[in-house]
């Protein structure tokens, strides 16, 4: 019965990462209450293996439901047989759940000798749970290149706990979310054992956490940078089969350029920047005729705007070919010859997608089984320049790069050439591989968290969704319906100033979590030394 409850709780937990199908205001409650189930099981057992298995089962259920959309890319677009695609998603979910199992085992091992019937020590287990879970999330975010999707902190993009994002980042929000679930589990535990005094203390701690969060939410972490700009975001909704069909290339480009050149609803607010999705041009820039690129430069001149355009780029560096997934900036003054040679403002993607943009060692057989146009790209260099337009500094990121929040931080600081740091973040993506599924809404929540961490607006131009504009406090100002072809004209106010998280990254919350486990280990040793010896 316990294991079935954990599976159901995990499935409900998966619903907390995007407002689909649940409304946005419920997500934080669903996350905390569902995660309280494995916390209760972990706190109630002295067996490390049982605690690890409880956290593992809960997490595996959550991931199987929460990242089901990977099946669509492998089966519908990759041609992988349905059983094999389902098995691949299942095995991946099991791998991701190992970090939760580690958190459960660590909590049980360090907490089982605590005297939890005393108020000062009663909060020990929830704190250990929060520290261990946070470290598990952090490890999941970089081991084997990392996959921090559905970090529990993202469930709180609209909750009071998000006020901690400018201080500790999403891992700090995850720490507090895990702590809230642990305190909730303790409240049930002490009610069950008729210890109302300790239960009241746990409830007070939980309430205090949200009161402090409310106070923090009043802090403004940024100043406005210059006047706002009008930005046009293009959502082409080009079918994947059409996008990578050479015979359909010009048709798909005409569709998206046609959207880009629509008259502005307010002639006084014509767009200064037009952002296209990732790989709007699904071939390398030097494989297109100069006449094509001249037409793009003419489009920029016609619109009196700078175009941010996603395209693969081919360059030659010291006699070696380099292939990158990139974003380029084009305006009326761009030289076609320089463009063909990649001598223009360009950002090359740094965090590549395993299986999509590079093949992990030992997995060539898996890639060969997929019928997807995969690339073998080179990684972009560190310290790439932002795009400067009308006094604003735009920092690009491509696809799921904005899932790795700490990697965006260097763009916020003064650049090597003395240029100011980014005042606007922008993401270009093509999530068409995953259909009109939860992943579109989940990615939007992730981008909202990046805005809160950095106190910067984030604009998102995607092929199928979610195309949106987010302000520096993580609020969605406007968005397009998914799976539609349209444009979104928005006023974007750039910002300046550095949050604490922008200065220190994930290091602070990781250190706090390690210290918490260290204190738990010291307490465990003391408890063992003071145990009476049985005769």
Spans of features found by a protein language model:
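Membrane-embedded alpha-helical bundles of multi-pass enzymes
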Residues: 1-220, 254, 428, 435-437, ...
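Conserved hydrophobic/aromatic beta-strand scaffold that supports enzyme active sites
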Residues: 14-17, 105, 233, 327-329, ...
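A generic fold-level signal
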Residues: 24, 144, 226, 320-322, ...
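Active-site catalytic loop in hydrolytic enzyme cores
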Residues: 72-87, 114, 141-166, 321-405, ...
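CN hydrolase (nitrilase-like) catalytic-core segments centered on the catalytic cysteine
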Residues: 92, 96, 281, 288-309, ...
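Alpha-helix termini
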Residues: 112-119, 264-269, 333-339, 414-419
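Non-cytosolic juxtamembrane linkers/loops
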Residues: 205-268, 432-443, 448-460, 465-504
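Soluble catalytic regions of membrane-associated enzymes that act on cell-envelope
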Residues: 214-358, 379, 384-391, 396-402, ...
């Amino acid at each position: 019965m316990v294991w079935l409850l954990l599976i159901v709780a995990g499935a409900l937990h998966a619903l907390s990462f995007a407002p689909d199908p649940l409304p946005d205001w419920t997500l934080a409650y669903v996350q905390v209450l569902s995660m309280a189930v494995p916390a209760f099981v972990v706190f109630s057992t002295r067996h490390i293996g049982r605690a690890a298995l409880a956290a593992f089962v809960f997490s595996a259920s959550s991931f199987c439901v929460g990242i089901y959309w990977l099946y669509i890319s492998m089966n519908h677009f990759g041609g992988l047989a349905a059983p094999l695609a389902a098995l691949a998603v299942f095995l991946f979910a099991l791998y991701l759940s190992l970090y939760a199992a580690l958190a459960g085992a660590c909590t049980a091992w360090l907490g089982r000798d605590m005297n939890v019937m005393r108020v000062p020590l009663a909060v020990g287990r929830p704190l250990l749970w929060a520290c261990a879970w946070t470290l598990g999330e952090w490890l999941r975010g970089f081991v084997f290149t990392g996959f921090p999707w559905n970090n529990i902190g993202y469930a709180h993009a609209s909750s009071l706990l998000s006020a901690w994002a400018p201080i500790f980042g999403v891992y700090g929000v995850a720490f507090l979310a895990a702590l809230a679930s642990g305190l909730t589990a303790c409240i049930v535990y002490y009610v069950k054992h008729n210890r109302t005094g300790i239960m009241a203390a746990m409830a007070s701690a939980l309430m205090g956490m949200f009161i402090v969060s409310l106070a923090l939410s009043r802090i403004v972490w940024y100043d406005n940078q210059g006047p706002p700009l009008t930005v046009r975001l293009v959502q082409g909704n080009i079918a994947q089969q059409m996008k990578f069909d050479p015979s359909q290339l010009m048709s798909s480009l005409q569709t998206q350029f046609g959207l880009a050149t629509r008259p502005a609803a307010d002639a006084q607010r014509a767009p200064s920047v037009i952002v296209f999705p990732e790989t709007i041009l699904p071939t390398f820039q030097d494989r297109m005729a100069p006449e094509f690129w001249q037409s793009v430069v003419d489009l920029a001149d016609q619109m009196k705007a700078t175009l941010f355009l996603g395209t693969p780029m081919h360059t030659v560096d010291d006699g070696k070919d380099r292939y990158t997934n990139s974003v380029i900036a084009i305006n009326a003054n761009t030289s076609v010859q320089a463009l063909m040679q990649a001598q223009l403002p360009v950002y090359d993607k740094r965090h590549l997608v395993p299986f999509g943009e590079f093949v992990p060692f030992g997995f060539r057989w898996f890639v060969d089984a997929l019928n997807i146009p995969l690339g073998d790209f080179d990684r972009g260099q560190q310290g790439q320049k932002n795009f400067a337009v009308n006094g604003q500094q735009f920092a690009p990121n491509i696809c799921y790069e904005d899932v790795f929040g700490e990697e965006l931080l260097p763009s916020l600081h003064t650049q090597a050439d003395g240029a100011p740091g980014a005042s606007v973040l922008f993401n270009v993506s093509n999530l068409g591989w995953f259909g009109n599924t939860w992943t579109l809404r989940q990615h939007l929540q992730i981008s909202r968290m990046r805005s809160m961490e950095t106190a910067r607006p984030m604009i998102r131009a995607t092929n199928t969704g979610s195309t949106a504009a987010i302000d520096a406090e993580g609020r969605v100002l406007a968005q397009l319906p998914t799976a539609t072809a349209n444009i979104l004209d928005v006023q974007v106010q750039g910002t300046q100033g550095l949050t604490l998280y922008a200065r220190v990254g994930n290091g602070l919350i990781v250190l706090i979590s390690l210290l918490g486990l260290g204190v738990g280990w010291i307490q465990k040793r003391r408890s063992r030394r003071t145990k009476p010896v049985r005769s």
